[in-house]
Amino acid sequence: MTVFLRLFFISLICLLPAAHSFSVENTAASFVGADVCAGCHADQYSLWKGSHHDWAMQAATQQSVLGDFNQVSFEHYGERTEFYRQGQDYYIKTQNAEGKMQAFKVAYTFGFYPLQQYLIPFPDGRMQALGVAWDSRPKAEGGQRWFHLYPDEA
């Protein structure tokens, strides 16, 4: 009987409201930058800096963009994609979801070698890479050209 009473009282205690309430502050995470990491992880940082992982995703700048954006175009199954610059900004003009030509500002590069893609921001907050990418290999190896990631698909 004493075991039953103990279990009964323990069950009742579990049903009582907690005496203390804890509040958890919801703070949004933000990117602090790689240099902050270097302060505590100098060896790992020196191995990472300049590697393909370092270059994996960069803001679209003259230093990071490898593709030819000098008013060139690429056509795949009748769909034309144009690459150009306006000042310091990089643009890709291609068909939008409605099938109409639209210019999209490139926000980021994605990848480095042997290919580089370009990320386009959309109004809903997504970043989208297009089906056309830049082959960053040397020309002698068949690179330095635009190509479609899915060559057999329209």
Where are the predicted features?
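Bacterial N-terminal signal peptides
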Residues: L7-A18
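Sequence context surrounding c-type heme c attachment/ligation sites in exported
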Residues: F22-N70, M127, G131-A154
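Short Fe-S-cluster ligation motifs
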Residues: S64-Q86
